[in-house]
Amino acid sequence: FVSVEVDPALARDTDRTTTDARALHELINAPNLMVKIPGTLEGLPSIRTMIGEGRSINVTLIFSVSRYIEVMESYVAGLEDAVASGQEDLSDIASVASFFISRTDTEVDRRLEEIGTDQALDLRGKTAVAQAQVAYQHFITTFSGPRWDALAAKGAQVQRPLWASTSTKNPRYSETLYVDELI
């Protein structure tokens, strides 16, 4: 797949994001295209709409487990919308959810250093991996069970988590910290 992003200035504008994503899909018109839509609150309806129209989407800028859950729900609901509109074969709809890793530790580490206790400092570099592990458990839950099985029977693909921003920003950490921990 190749990903092309909607204009980032539209991240807080549902209607224009949807219009831009649709226009990119129609302009490029390639089966291996994923249009990037930011995982903002305003992006969630666009994700659902595009998936419901049978278009492949790369959801970007996911920084929290709660938002990741909302992104997966938008994807699954979009697949259900596709079925409700008469699409019987869902196998051509693909999506990834780009969950950003290192930026979480960058922010949390800064706050832990402000606290400055030994206990706080011992937690540096651990939040992002822990959050990704929790997110993965939600992935397992979302893409199993009767609701998912009904979609999978029509060829639906899981929305794969994409661990993004896996290079460390802190020079004290191994360059492969996140890759090593998440494999």
List each language-model region with its residue ranges:
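Acidic (Asp/Glu)-rich catalytic clusters
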Residues: 22-29, 51-52, 87-91
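Catalytic alpha/beta core domains of metabolic enzymes, predominantly
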Residues: 47, 55-182
